[in-house]
Structures are given as structure tokens and as C-alpha cells.
Amino acid sequence: MEFSASLRDNKVMRWSVLAITSLTLFASYFFTDVLSPLEDMLIRDLHWDGSQYGFFSGQYSFLNIIGFIILGGVILDRLGIRRTGLWFTILMLLGASVKYYALTSYFNNGGFGYDFFNSFWVDFKPSVKLASLGFMIFGLGSEMAGITLTKVVVKWFKGKELALAMGLQVSVSRIGTAAVFVIAPAFAKTGGLTSPVIFGLALIFIGLLSFIVYMIYDLKLDNQVQGLLAGEEEIFRWSDMTKVVANRGFVYISMLCVLFYACVFPFLKFATNLMINKYGVSSDIAGEIVFILPFGTVLLTPIIGYFIDRKGKGASIMILGSILLVLVHLVFAFLPGNIYFALGGMFILGVAFSLVPSALWPAVPKIVPDQYLGSAFAMIFWVQNIGLWLFPMLIGSVREWSNPGVSAALQEGKDVLFDYTAPMFMLVLVGVVALLFAILLRKADASKGYGLELPNERK
């Protein structure tokens, strides 16, 4: 169905909408990784260890993996973009505030709630438990806000520059991730551990205000089209789940998604520490090396998306990106601690992280019929969050297992280093499985005719 002339037909207006909502997305991704370059400070100042840090990092996805993200999808379908986006952006702010409070000296010196969080699970610090609670609340709000913002892009760009707009949206999220590895260490050096966290909290508040501004334009658009847009949106039905999971191509692309992303985002939470321990650089330099990955994706993702939109080859591009992923983690696992290997590895990982997402997300509508698309995206995000929850804990646990006594020595102020061979080799194995699913997806495309190798044209 074509939309009647409306605000969305005004090129300046729809790109302005993308810019406004991108502030919310930027804030979400910045705050998600704000502590990633600061693990050494968490160990030294708050006496966390690798397992506790890994546990905390994984809690971002906990509420999502137990089904709340699917419930959120139902809420989005039932209540629409405005109310859903507002509620979950507020939830982001709430979770971020709890996480910040858990890291403050007031709380850790016996402030409100300390005794309660110290009364159970005594092997973990109270700050770990409260920060994890805040992070899981934030994670639910962040993921649902992200899905809502994706729906915003579809609403305003359908039939127009949709692929480019989605590519730019991905780029904004990568800028948010990249900024952490430059800004957070600098802020922490001058203002302490909580300084970059409160900066991220301020960004979340600005993102909330930005979404409120967007709501005004969204209401105007709905009034103009008189329900045409709402009429095209699919209502989530539980019965759709069985039809979706019976689709072999959907299973392959979902597994590729969870395994590929599990080798990137959880890795980033340990990447700064890897650079410090294996390559012998300072925390500032380590953050700048890690910055290469998201910065590279900012530039490459829209370009690759533009290419796929017009030339196709999506399935082949996913295979290529998966091969690069395996090679990168082999470099980090086994090659010597030469800084040039670190620089080259992060650059190639950035290329891989541009190739696969650029091809993966536009492929979903080719594999899944339109009437099940809402259910499909909810399930993919759900499976992806399982990986984002599980793998930080796995990486942290494998690192602790392969480095007995190192965290304890660091807490005592001793000059010791982590060996990252074992956790990186684990990611190599995960990457190999991701590559196998990319190959299976290419074969399924050849037999089922999904059109993944064809340009991204609407069916």
C-alpha cells in the first residue's frame, strides 16, 4: 500500500526525524558500554573480579532473554510508537540511574540499600548486584527503544531511502559505542569512575527529551494519513511463532545473528583490557585502538548497505564477514603481542562488523513473509539477547579459569597480566559455527529462492 502525501514525503522532514531520534539511539549505545574501558578501575576501586564483571556485563540482556522483549513487542503493536517509546526510554533512564548509584562512594560506604545487597550472595560485591539490577532494567528499556526506533525509520522511510536510513542508524549506534572508548577513560582519569557514568546518564536524559520532540511529529503524521500507517502494521500473534521457526532460512539467519554478535559486543567489553594485557599499551591507547572498530563501521556500513541495495550479494557478504571474524580472533588468540597486530585486527573486525549486519537485517524481510515479520524480529532480538547475556559471563569465566589467582593479585596491587589465549580461542570456535550457519543460509537461499543475492527491492 502506498501512503498518501504527508510529512514523510518531505525529504527534509524525514531526515530531520532520523536525526532527532538518533540522539536517543546514540545515548543508549554510549551508556551500554560506558564501563567497558574501565574494568581495571572496577577491579582496583570496587574490588570486582573478572567473573563479577562478566556477570554484570551479561545482565543487560537478562530481562530480554526471559521473554520481556517479546512482551515489549506486543506492547509496541498494541500501543504504538509514541507511548511505547516514551515508556521504555523512561525505563532506560531509571535503570541508568540505579547503575550510577551502585558505583557511587555513598552507596559503597554503607549508603541506602547497601546492607540489603550485602545480605545475600555474599561472594559478589553489593555494588555488582545493584549495578547488575540497574543494567538489566536499562537493557530492557534500551532494546525496546531500539526496536521502536527501527519501526520509526520504517514508518518514515518505507518506499524511499529505507536501506540508507537504516545504515545510518547503525552508524549512529556505532558512534555511540566508539565514543565510549575515547571519552570514558578521559573522564575517569580526571573525575573518577563515576564521572563517565554520570555523563552517560545526562545523555540518556537528552535522548528522552529528543524522543518527546519526535512524538509531536509522529502525531502530526498519524493525523495526516488518518490511520493508513497503523493499518499496515502487523499485530503480534503467538500462533505466528510456530510458522516462523519452521522456516529453515529464519533459523539459519537467527543463529548467524546470535553467534556473530556474540563474538563482537561481548568481546568489546574485554577489548580494552585485552589491549592493555597482551599488547602492553596504556588504558588511553587501548581505548583508541578499540575505537577503530566502531569508527570503521560508521564509515563502511552505509556504503555496504548502499551496495547491497543496488547490487545484492547479501548471502555472500555474510559469509565473507564471518570468515574475517574467525581470522581476527585467531590473531588475538595466537599471534604475538605486537601492536600492529592489534591495530590490524581491530580494523578487520570493523570491516566484518560492517559486512554482516549490513546484509543480515535487510535479508530478514526476504526470508519471512510480511504477515510474520513482527514476530520474526522479536524472536531474532530475543535470541540475540541470549548471546549478549551469556557470552560476557563465558568470556569472564574462561579468563578466570585460565588465569588462576590473577584477579586476586590485581586486587592486592600486584603487577600481573591476564593471558587472553583461552577466551579468544573460544570466540574462534564460536565464529567457525557462525560461518557454518552463513554457508547453510547461502545454500538455503539457492534452494528456496529467498533472493538474498539479489538487490534489496521490495517484493
Residue ranges with predicted function:
Residues I90-D123, I323-G337:
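C-terminal ends and interior cores of transmembrane alpha-helices
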Residues V128, G134-V172:
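Cytoplasmic helix-loop-helix junction between adjacent transmembrane helices
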Residues G314-L360:
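C-terminal transmembrane helical hairpin of 12-TM major facilitator-type secondary transporters
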